């Protein structure tokens, strides 16, 4: 087992996975069991995360030296800059902010 887990916790997780739900009530019960497993494995700090924050996805951003445009924005510490060069001429790439 990995650090912080016990055979009982692992067995509980295996039981949850092997007994897939057949209806909405069973799905709710399974969700509660999985939340208990998360709490046991990762601590109680996960149980305090609001539901909308836990399920929301962060917007994706382009990293350094990745092509960018008006739909694909650069990450916070980068800016979309037009480059000069050979085949990549007139394309924009994410570069570190100047100044």
Swiss-Prot record:
Q: Give the superkingdom in one word.
A: Eukaryota
- Keyword check for Disulfide bond, yes or no: yes
Record-linked InterPro entries: Toxin_22
Q: Which residues form a coiled coil?
A: none
Tissue expression per record:
Expressed by the venom gland.
Record keywords: Cleavage on pair of basic residues, Disulfide bond, Knottin, Neurotoxin, Secreted, Signal, Toxin
Q: What does this protein do?
A: Inhibits voltage-gated sodium channels by binding to site 3. Insecticidal neurotoxin.
This protein's name: Mu-hexatoxin-Mg1c
Species of origin: Macrothele gigas (Japanese funnel web spider)
């Amino acid at each position: 087992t990995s650090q912080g887990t016990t055979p009982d916790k692992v067995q509980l997780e295996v039981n949850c996975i092997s007994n897939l739900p057949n209806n909405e009530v069973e799905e709710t019960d399974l969700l509660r069991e999985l939340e208990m497993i998360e709490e046991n494995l990762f601590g109680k700090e996960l149980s305090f995360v609001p539901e909308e924050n836990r399920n929301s996805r962060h917007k994706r951003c382009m990293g350094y030296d990745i092509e960018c445009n008006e739909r694909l924005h650069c990450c916070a510490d980068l800016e979309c800059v037009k480059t000069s060069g050979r085949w990549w001429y007139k394309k924009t790439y994410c570069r570190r902010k100047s100044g």
